[in-house]
Design a protein with these regions (language model features):
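Short, charged low-complexity linear segments at domain edges
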Residues: 155-180, 208-227, 279-283
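SIR2/sirtuin NAD+-dependent deacylase catalytic core
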Residues: 187
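Auxiliary alpha/beta "docking" domains used to position bulky ligands
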Residues: 1-184, 233-234
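Conserved active-site and cofactor/substrate-binding residues in soluble primary-metabolism enzymes
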Residues: 107, 163, 206, 237, ...
């Protein structure tokens, strides 16, 4: 089977396994991204996310993750919800409404790799879903999935940015897609203007240690310091402000993945309900949820902070 048939098969299987986009880029060292990442880390924009400092060489070179790698296959999976969270409740980022996307998408990637091996033969490859040293957005751009917006998110033309990004790095030669050369954000600055913590800097740079998502998910301290004393607008887990205001997301449409449907009662949980919840109940109710990343203590800390600010 030649590279043209490899490519056709990969894209057909991607649709069969529930992905909304599949693009392929040549596996190579990301020299420009390496410089940007180095500068971002040097400025301390990653805050306490010290894991970002590790495995630098792996992040910029897929051939060090999969020996003999020739192609990086990017997949997108829509998570735009049909049901919006009602106002008046602690806000949860849309990506966390349902089951943990890591588990859902990793299963699909493994099944896809199995199918490729059955149809082509032995393949050296690995799947990645936002939990390994892979620069997913860079590969998504290189594979023609979209462009990087001012808010740092990948934006698909006429579809928006509510997508999970996943990758397969394989030793197959394929026909490679071309990146979208134009930046369709133009002069729009809605995401920059709307960010209440001024976390979006020029040149598509995110100062993560000012971001609401960072403070509500990644920060492990028991107390949110006064240095971060800004308007959190009722966010208890993550933040969607810079995506919600993006004009391109008016083209988004509801996902078709049953596992991403909101966990029952999640979107209408009150502050009191969260604060009164016990650990056993939390683990049982959200055992397959991204909310486990913050742990119950983290979510309670966030809600107590909101209350202290009169929210």
């Amino acid at each position: 089977m030649n590279q043209f048939k490899h490519t056709q098969l990969i894209k057909e299987l991607a649709l069969q396994h529930g992905f909304d986009f599949c693009g392929i880029a040549e596996a190579k060292e990301l020299t420009e991204d390496a410089f940007r990442l180095e500068q971002w880390l040097a400025k301390g924009f990653h805050g306490d996310m010290h894991y970002m400092e590790k495995h630098f060489d792996l992040r910029i070179n897929p051939k060090k993750l999969v020996p003999g790698a020739k192609s990086v296959i990017t997949f997108l999976k829509n998570y735009s919800p049909e049901q919006e969270q009602p106002s008046g409740f602690p806000k949860i980022a849309k990506y966390a409404y349902g089951q943990d996307y890591h588990e859902v998408i990793k299963l699909a990637l493994n099944q896809m790799l199995d199918d490729l091996r059955q149809k082509i033969g032995p393949i050296e490859g690995r799947g990645f879903v936002d939990s390994a040293p892979v620069l997913e957005r860079s590969w998504a751009w290189l594979s023609g999935a979209g462009w990087i917006g001012k808010n740092g998110n990948l934006i698909q033309p006429k579809k928006g940015s509510y997508f999970f990004i996943a990758s397969l790095i394989v030793d197959l030669e394929c026909v490679y897609d071309q990146p979208i050369a134009k930046d369709y954000c133009g002069t729009c600055t809605k995401c920059i203007d709307a960010c209440p913590t001024q976390a979006i800097l020029p040149n598509k740079t995110i100062e993560a240690n000012h971001c609401i998502s960072y403070y509500t998910i990644e920060l492990k301290k028991q107390q949110i310091e006064t240095a971060s004393d800004r308007s959190y607008q009722d966010w208890a887990f993550g933040c969607d402000i810079c995506q919600d205001v993006c004009p391109w997301n008016r083209f988004s449409h509801p996902h078709q993945e049953s596992k991403f449907k909101p966990i029952e009662g999640l979107l209408t949980m009150s502050k009191d309900a969260w604060l009164e919840m016990e650990e056993v109940s939390f683990k049982a109710r959200f055992k397959q949820s991204p909310l486990l990343r913050s742990k119950l203590n983290g979510i309670k800390r966030n809600i107590e902070y909101l209350r202290s600010r009169g929210r």
